[in-house]
């Protein structure tokens, strides 16, 4: 959520910055709402003052023995007008809030201008794609040869875009998540955190999934049903519960940064992905991810983003998986992001790089929604924190990359050296 003062005082400047990401801010509606708010605010305050004055007059008239009925009727009429003005103001404030909640974040000045992913900026590459002297198999064929990926069973149990993993493939999937968690907690300074997989609507508003992206979530009740204590959604990423741990909190600045990581399943309806990546593990309704979240002082967040993406890169480097780092253009960034890097891993069967991690600085966009603040030592005044999040990594896509990059001519998979301690010392599977 953008700063309301910025929207009120500099709407044209905000509109110009948002236009860089292809968003047209309705400045006329914004101004009309603000003008009406000012009128109602003054009207409400005047009616309240007049009602208080008239109420005081009733006591004075009564003490003098005068007939107070005319004054009482006048006070009642003022009360009705005040209630009506308050109701209209409350409705308008709700409308303004809904309007503001739908506005995306302002891109950082360094973000390249562009319409879509074709205009993203490649920053660097690491590793050389392996040259195979045999016909490359994709991860689906390799997983089925190893009797470890069973898509048919998942369809029987649930439906499409789900998977049943078995045996050594399931072991490798678990090993990857354990390796990532150990790396982040032992070398990168994160606190491992276990979080709920169901969250309430307040959490989803806090990190920006609601109200705009409700159809992308799996809800325990219809989204249009009135919110209640039991109206939950499955998490689309553990960014949601991890970041919301600081909702409504005031943190002492000397405790920052906070660095948290969690391994969770993630659940997404993929409402806009019909027909895309229908084969294999690339785009699933349920997938595992190791998430990294930073809570920082405002002045530290851009440096923290570089650190965050470096931690995700380290996972790929230790697995010896070729990848490239991409700076997203304005038109390809997520709704709440100021600046985003994607890491794309090389998939031999697709002969291309595919996203495996997205790392974003959200600035104070989420913090304003969550009322997450920090306070400098010895001061009473608070300020909003900055929040960052990144995949470290998507476990299923990492499994895909390992299967395809480490495949042998006979269909077996060499186990990356760093995973062997997590896989009973196995050097090959399949």
Swiss-Prot record:
One of its GO terms (cellular component) is cytoplasm. GO terms for molecular function: ATP binding; serine-tRNA ligase activity. It is found in: Cytoplasm. Residues 45-58 have a biased composition (Polar residues). Keywords: Aminoacyl-tRNA synthetase, ATP-binding, Cytoplasm, Ligase, Nucleotide-binding, Protein biosynthesis. Catalyzes the attachment of serine to tRNA(Ser). Is also able to aminoacylate tRNA(Sec) with serine, to form the misacylated tRNA L-seryl-tRNA(Sec), which will be further converted into selenocysteinyl-tRNA(Sec). Homodimer. The tRNA molecule binds across the dimer. This is Serine--tRNA ligase.
